[in-house]
């Protein structure tokens, strides 16, 4: 079904109005197509340059290589109560979304003149079912400086999708809530730009790169079960629950670039399609109260700013093809990771890397983390002043909390217990504040700092029943150790090695393995 004439539309959103499609079984019948292996496919429905469109209670079946339903330059549309099933399973070169939101441009949406760059706005996609297809809803192409706006995707059911359920490319003011996704390759993918498929209008004046971002997106109360690892088009597909990412177009040499299934290296040139080189961030995305399970990463954030992960439950299964992490952050700024509960996985619970250049601190607060194959929390080059507070971290196969190469970090009020390595370990972290933590029954030292973690404060902590010492300080100077309690540690209460302790007072020692409690080696302890 095609709406309208290919040449005579008024353009914008004024070409067609007040369209309703109610019911019907629309079978694309790909099995009857000869030479399916050749290039090309077909779209079931195409609607462009329209306002007030309703599609409801329809069933779409058996598509070949493309979209069941494609909207471009459409405002005020609802798609409700529809079912999308069946896709040629032998095709692995792409696997397009069942519902595609697009723009009126010649390379994106040909055959609907004028090509004025009109995008989709005010779209509701609700109470639909997607089964045995490649991908569900979203966009994989965009017009630079023209975001898709006011998109609501809620209460849909997705089952047995080889790729992602939802792709929000250059979306703003969007709500994704109440969806159930089972056995999907990926859950929800949010991305600022996609250089390889970004387009500009002829003569368009472009804003600076930094002005282009996806923002104000709420991802809430979704259930996502990630499928077993798979190969698609002979490439490994790394599954995920939620992936929030910006992009670095070429021209910023040496930066990490996000990868996706059909653009693994983001190899488009910096001037591809007229898009300026630069950093394109994701801003203001909140992922909260989602339930994520299965074999991929729980939540990933890359080149993100002012984003929140709150109250999510993540239950991962270990797989043999790649490592999976509860929450992973790379190159972020002002990221808040709060009140999440996560377990399983053969990598880290929370992994943060490369936020050191950010002017805004990151906060990891009141999360519960257990049963990961590496560290419960690992922060490398954390933003200066970053805070890790009041988390419960247990039964991980390495350390409870590991922080490396970070200044002025605050580690406060955490419970670390039954981890195979240290409870808390800081390496190369000057001016750290390690206060009021409880570290017990870990397989090594309760708290350890080393590698020039100078001028740090260790105060008010309780270290008990650890398999080695309660506290170990190595190769650091200007350290204060005051008001801590060391109880029933197997070796010493505290060890000071090649270090200078400026203050060591008001500490309490009870039944540690060595009666002298403190072991020193090549160290100086102030008598003050």
Predicted regions and their residues:
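Short "repeat-start/strand-capping" segments in structured domains, especially the N-termini
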Residues: 17, 50-53, 71-77, 121, ...
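Core solenoid repeat modules with strong leucine/isoleucine-rich periodicity
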Residues: 173, 180-266, 275-382, 387-394, ...
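Leucine-rich solenoid repeat scaffolds
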Residues: 477-528
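Solenoidal tandem-repeat scaffolds enriched in leucines and small polar residues
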Residues: 61-144, 148-150
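Short glycine/acidic-rich loop motifs that flank beta-strands on beta-rich extracellular proteins
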Residues: 30-36, 42-43, 64-71, 88-98, ...
